């Protein structure tokens, strides 16, 4: 078997004073925090597509990467070489998990039968790699957006045969995820949306998408898949408008089709900002609704209006996000999955390590600071105090449904109430949080 990353040693934790570019400065997998190791809290995963499939092209230019695992006599041989490279990378980096789309790991072929046969062979290859290395699958998914057949959608397509083709891919991708002991299955509707309303029946397409998701849930129970089903929100790109716009939109969709107890969300940082929200907002919203499943850890560029999928470097942002996750009990089956890609000019194989090492150190620093915020309870206590009156008889009775509008109007008049505003102390709280982050 070829060694693809000969110049890179196994990446180890060396501490903040290390000058070794191939060492973690802050990510110490075995460090104990709140009763768990750092690795158990973060559950880090590497994505297959950007890391091993993307060749550095963009809409204005051709490939800039020259990946040795792409040079093979056949597509299947290239897929197997890619698997060798991937698991060498996972092992040297020391991550516990990875994730993939079906066509990341297997050639699509020239027919649906070739697709099925190729994928089945590659699942066996992946299974052997997992057993040999101990690397686990965080989640699997099907790519129902890249092939031209999906230009008008997959589940929302006007043609039911394309719906059936997408169903075939999801059927086999779910089965593969179960066979590989994956802990989640993700559904991202990259083409589930519209370019123009002039040729779009919104009600019909939403009904099609709802039925597709119901079928996914049915299949989960049929095959005994014990992982979590996840929808990944995104407002646009590649379509003008996607139906899974943001967390709140997805929750409304799930409620409409009776799926709110069956499917959670996989939040991506860059998707949140494209929707006009902060990453913190989307995580907090998902946690408040009880539907946070997993996180695609990356960041966008504030000056650009598209999905740049950069490696996360903001400890400020990820401290607040990790704080929300810890408040809600931490990850169960999900984790921080790096949906990240190098910049086109970062051509060297070593750059893959630099990007992931920095991202893992960012998560480690953020976790340590979020844990301190949880343990000190200062922020939580201030929030509790802000809403304390809702625990008194009036507030509790309102929420319990014991009062009508008329009751409250009579109460206000009888008691001549004159409630006064109280400072929200935002600036003080921001200073407090900075004290944790920059200490």
Swiss-Prot record:
Mg(2+) 1 binds at residues 232, 268, 296, 339. Binds 2 magnesium ions per subunit. GO terms for cellular component: cytoplasm. GO terms for molecular function: magnesium ion binding; xylose isomerase activity. The active site is at residues 101, 104. Its EC number is 5.3.1.5. Its cofactor is Mg(2+). Its main location: cytoplasm. Keywords: Carbohydrate metabolism, Cytoplasm, Isomerase, Magnesium, Metal-binding, Xylose metabolism. It comes from the Bacteria. GO terms for biological process: D-xylose metabolic process. It catalyses: alpha-D-xylose = alpha-D-xylulofuranose. The keyword Magnesium applies. Mg(2+) 2 binds at residues 268, 271, 307, 309. It is an enzyme of class 5 (isomerase). InterPro entries: Xyl_isomerase-like_sf (IPR036237), Xylose_isom_bac (IPR013452), Xylose_isomerase (IPR001998). It is found in: Cytoplasm. HAMAP family: Xylose_isom_A (MF_00455). Belongs to the xylose isomerase family. Homotetramer. This is Xylose isomerase. It comes from Marinomonas sp. (strain MWYL1). The gene is xylA.
